[in-house]
Amino acid sequence: MTAMVVPAAFSAFAQDSSQTKATELEKVTVTGSLIPQSEIETATPITTITAEDIKARGFNSVADVLQKSSFATGGVQGAQSSNTFTQGAKTVSLFGLPPGYVKYLIDGRPMSNYPALYDGSDTFNNISGIPIDLVDRIEILPGGQSSLYGSDAIAGVINVILKKKMDGAVFSIRGGGYSEGGGSNFRATFADGWTSADGRTSVIGGVQYEEKDPIWAYQRDLTKQYNTQGYTPQLVGRAFLVNSYRSSYKFLDPANCGNVSGLFGGTMNLQRRVGFGDEYYCGSPNVAGYRTLSNSLKSGQAYVHGTFDVNDNVQLYGDVLYSHEQTKYHSGAELIWWGSSADFGYYYDPNVGDLVNLQRVFAPEEMGINGIKDTMSRDKSESVRVTFGAQGTLGQSNWDYDAGVTYTQYKLEERNFVRFKDPIDQFFLDRVMGPQQEGVDPIFNSYPVYTPDYAAFYQPISQQDFASFTGHATNKSKTSDGMIRLQATNATLFSLPGGDAGLAIVGEYGKQKWDYDPDANLLNGSIWGLSSVAGGGDRDRYALTSELRMPVFEPLTITLAGRYDAFKASGRTIDKPTYSIALEYRPFESLLLRGKYGTAFRAPTLSDLYQSKSGYYSSVIDYYQCAQRGFLPGNTEKCPSTYSSHQFKGTQSGNLDLKPINADVWSVGLVWSPVDRMALTVDYLNWDISDEVTQQSADGLSLQDYRCRAGIDDINSALCAATEAQVTRNQAGQITGIYTPKINVSNQKLEALTASFRYGYDFGRWGDLSTVTSYTGNIRHKYTRYAGDTAVDLLNNPYWSTDPKRKADTALTWEIGNFSTTWFASWFDKTPNYASTIDVKGYAAERAGKLPSYITHNASVTYKAFEGMELSLMVNNVFNKMPPLDASYSGGTRWAYNELNFDAFGRAYYLEMRYSFGK
């Protein structure tokens, strides 16, 4: 459910009357500023989600908190997204911007990047390995924040702050599961703190262990078989199929699927698709259910934080956070298959008199003694984060300092289930295909001739045979980031009519590394139907940051911030200065008007720079050849298809010449707190993002190649020389290859409105009632991929985006005596149905439309049984809400809902016991 927006300002507004004036409040440092100050709510909107909020609203992980935040309007790939590159990781998209546009911090210092790439191309952070029970609070800053936090802080900054103080030892144990089955989980946490008798030494430590079973698609009615509520009758997957070149299906099983009827739990039988040749094949409706919706998990984290006061002016500090995670998942039995077309192409069978292919899916009964579970893939990760340093005051001055070193490392081992190319082909050659016959086909005079034993094809295989051509391929990858950071701060630099001006100066030096080393078999072509791409590199980085906060007079405060970042890689330096100007105006005590303008950026990631070359196949208009035949650019509709849709082999890779992604960002808003325990915030945010990284256009290169060859552009120019190097032609003048590296070319324009409201009232003996509501609405979001393209309206073009425009949530908490209960509701706006997302016509396409808005509810109750003991019951998705019916999916769909927006987990129950020792 959506993480509740809790205005940090409220903690200041809710002080009792003796503390209402800012000048009487203790100065603290909050995310969004480097300078300690009394006013927690500043020109930068900040949202705080406390440990109490996390528990009361039923959130199970940091990823759960952030993905359900009202800011997170963008859908992201995850455990439900079968056959993606990072199925074992979790991330978030703020305002529908890419996941890599968020800066993640732990205790104010950057997190290490995940070693694998989101969607196979982009660097991002995995937020699944943070121990939720050891989190003190999470702070979210929407909008560009690069002038303080550097690269990546375009969509916002998320700072996870771990516990630093404890009154005594705490032990908690939690267990639960889902009413529909699967997902049973267990979590135990122990934390304790110690302070020396003289108060100079303080240590806090904690450990957390968690286990969770997977949720299988066969455990949910919606996903256990192929779609039964589509616009066509159910189309069962083709587990055993002979496919003809000319007449589609050929059914050649003399036993009419009888020999394979025991597969997939005895559900394999004769199936029919009208209009497809012979129309018959062997299939099971339950093939679709053999995949995971939610990963299994075994994880453990350990955390230690300590301080030692050397004297009144020097404090040493250090902390260590270690995480180990193992997730298992399955992309689907339907994806574990073999087909003759992959390595043989069509073959000619003289007994059939046609060109045909074989295709068959392997069943759980063939896979091993544990069935489908024996073919799961596994991700094992290990991350460590170490920080140590010193902080204090420089002599008797007003200057505070903080000098620290942080090192993070993230190791990932992806163990993927694979089929080995030569053994699996040889197995079917020996068992089914038989020896190649003399001659070639009489139709095209090019395809080989085989006379397969089709009765042998329509047979189960033994688990031993299956094991002979399957196994695992292991990819190993690692990221690391070392940083030295020096900060000097003076909160009373000089006096102004509104108060003391403050200044902070920060210097940073760091070294970043990334290495992705796929299994050798994935690189040399030994794996059937699967490949990978290697990459790796390192760079040094430098940064200098300053912030000046000036209370010009009592109602008005101006804050200036500037930062310079430089990255040195492969002898090249990429640098970027950023700045921001922020205004806070308080016409009276209960109202804050605020505004901020600045710049933000994202440096080219190490994967952008160093991802190795990989191949792909596509088609392109050969503008030069079309022009030779009288069809100039813009008039190629009648150009022969050989040239107007010319097949070529493309090559893509990283690019050392990439520049930073740039953004101009600004916001205006207000915070209003007319009475105690009431606060309203409203903020408008605006982004203008340019130079985004995308793959270079093959169409654009073909067009430029024509311009150079036609003499429109100087053939001897650097532009034409570069184009000639990227577009390869054979002796006949036909395009054979195009090199399309990553380039800076795209841009986005985004406007959003965020709001939150909080109110609480003490009813005396009837208890205390409080409510919090948050809202995010994207007003405008346009994307232009290549220069000259028409901007795409991402809010109204479902072919490009399925994200909801608006998202909101509300929580109602009642505390009375020893009881506390919370009701939490999460809502998001209408989203496109499936038909509108697969056709360039969008909502004008056949069967296109919108799905209704979607709301779910969580409830929790906590009882203080006795001093130190708390018992809690939490129910998530109280009404067991499933994704809305989308009848625009066909009957052949494995799951008939958008997994980026919805899940089919259903209702979950959790029981928790928490005991605080010494109370």
Give each language-model segment a name.
Residues 62-65, 90-93, 125-128, 152-173, ...:
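N-terminal periplasmic accessory domains that precede
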